[in-house]
Amino acid sequence: MKKYILGLLKYLFYKRVSFFAQVTFDSIISKKSKINRFSKVYSSSILEYSYIGPKTELVLASVGKYCSIAQNCSIGLATHTMNNISTSPIFTEQYNATSFSWIDKDTINHKKNIVEIGNDVWIGKNATILSNVKVGNGAIIGTGAIVTKDVPDYAVVAGVPAKIIKYRFSEEVINRLLEIKWWDLPEDILKKNIHLFQKENITIGDLNKIIIK
C-alpha cells in the first residue's frame, strides 16, 4: 500500500494517468502514455504513446512504445514460491498481498519474472500474459487469450493456451519493419509519413518510401 500511496503523489500531475488508477512509486511512466481508471501498475514501465485500458493490471512488466492494451487484462501475474514450505508471500516479500510485513527485505528475485512487451503491440480485452514471457514487436494478442510462452514479432496469437494463428505480414516485410524500427523515429518524421500508416497491406516498396530525414 505504501508503494501505491507514494506513486499517487508521484504521478498526481500526470494528466494522462487516471486519479483512480494505482501506480507504484517505482514504476516508470512516460508523460505521453495513458493509464485509465481502476488499472493497477506494479513495478512496471510504460513508454510513449502506449495506453492501458480500465481495470487492467501490470505486474513487473515493461511496455514499449505505441502499444494498445485493452481493459481487464492481466499482465505479469504475481508469482509464489513452490519449493518452499509455504506459497504465501508473507514469508518472502516485504510488501505483499496480505498487508502484513514480517521481513525487512524481499528474499526472492522478482526481476527474473519480468514480462517484456515490445513496441506496437495490441492486446485484446481479457487477455492474460503469464510472468517471464516476451511479446515481440508488432504482435497481436487475441481477446481472452492466455499467453504462456514467448510470442514472435508480428505474430497473431489467440486461444487458451495462446497459439500462433498467422503473421501480420510476409517475412520480407516483417524483416524490413524490424530494420526501420519506426517506433524510434522522431514524431515529426512519423507525421510526415502518416499517409503510409493509414494504408492497408503495405509492401516493401511502401516501407522504402518512408522519409527518415
Feature map (PLM): residue ranges:
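C-terminal segments of enzyme domains that contribute to small-molecule binding surfaces
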Residues: 88-129, 161-213
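Beta-rich strand-turn-strand
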Residues: 127-139, 145-148
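Membrane-proximal basic amphipathic "stem/tether" segments
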Residues: 1-30
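Catalytic-loop signature of eukaryotic-like protein kinases
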Residues: 120, 138, 155
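Glycine-centered loop/turn positions within well-structured domains
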Residues: 83, 149, 153-155, 163
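Flexible, glycine/small-residue-enriched loop-and-beta-strand segment within the central core
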Residues: 34, 41-133
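Conserved G/P- and acidic residue-centered "switch" motifs that form tight phosphate/ATP-binding loops
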Residues: 141, 159
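Conserved catalytic-core motifs of eukaryotic protein kinase domains, centered on the activation segment
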Residues: 79-81, 151, 167-169
